Amino acid sequence: MRNFLITGISRGLGCEIAREILLNGDAVYGISRTLSDEAKELARDFPERLKLRLYDLSDTDGILKCVFKEFIGLKTPIHGYVNNAAIAYDDIATNMQMPRLENMYKVNVFAPMIMTKYAIRNFILHHVKGSIVHISSISVHTGYKGLSMYASTKGAMEAFSKNIAREWGGKGIRSNAVVAGFMETSMSASLTPEQKSKIFNRTSLKSPTSLKSVAGTVAFLLSESAESITGQNIFVDSGTI
């Protein structure tokens, strides 16, 4: 049985990724700022293999102590880390407010960089050829009004992921990004039907991206079947063009 660390596990994509991993017989250490009914139900279904910890990733100073020392434990090997947690700041650049921008960068960029640092240290300590998967966004590659600031955080993580793959490939450690299209999640709930229709009409499939498709891709990248895949951006976006 392998152990995987997932952030943003409470609902939506994070919960679906956790479910995929648990159904494969592995264990999940899940981090979330809140605990949803969806996550509670998952914990009831997998009481021995799903461990949950409430933690606000904007508190970057506490990650080592609260996540890696107290929650996982330094003696516990982890075999993969999924950076799924993110917050959105939807607005045009001329309306930028620094406190909101800084908080988004803390959660979307600085926290996963620090989490990656300690995940790699855990891999090396336990002689694990670990896999890191960052959830990115199609907004990095195809412009959307109001997403310039959010997209910049995901673009930063794509660059980080590719360079981590280069730095640590010699240890058998892999790093990839899954570029997800627009999904029906709480993050997109504020969009009007008209806005959603415009977005989905830009895709080849004329439909939202399936949570299951993204989660299944993440599970594959974490598996040994993907042992030769690293430094890549894998698009799961309903064919956005």
Q: For each predicted feature, which ranges?
A:
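Alpha-helical segment proximal to the catalytic Tyr-Lys
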Residues: 121, 125, 162, 166-170, ...
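Conserved glycine-rich cofactor-binding loop
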Residues: 10-11
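Conserved mid-core segment of classical short-chain dehydrogenase/reductases
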Residues: 87-102, 121, 146-149, 187-192
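C-terminal substrate-recognition "lid" of short-chain dehydrogenase/reductases
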Residues: 207-236
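Active-site loop immediately N-terminal to the catalytic Tyr-X3-Lys motif
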Residues: 94, 142-148, 206, 224
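Active-site helix of classical SDR
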Residues: 116, 153, 161
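Residue(s) in the substrate-gating loop at a strand-loop-helix junction
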Residues: 137
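Catalytic Tyr-X3-Lys loop
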Residues: 87, 94-114, 133, 157
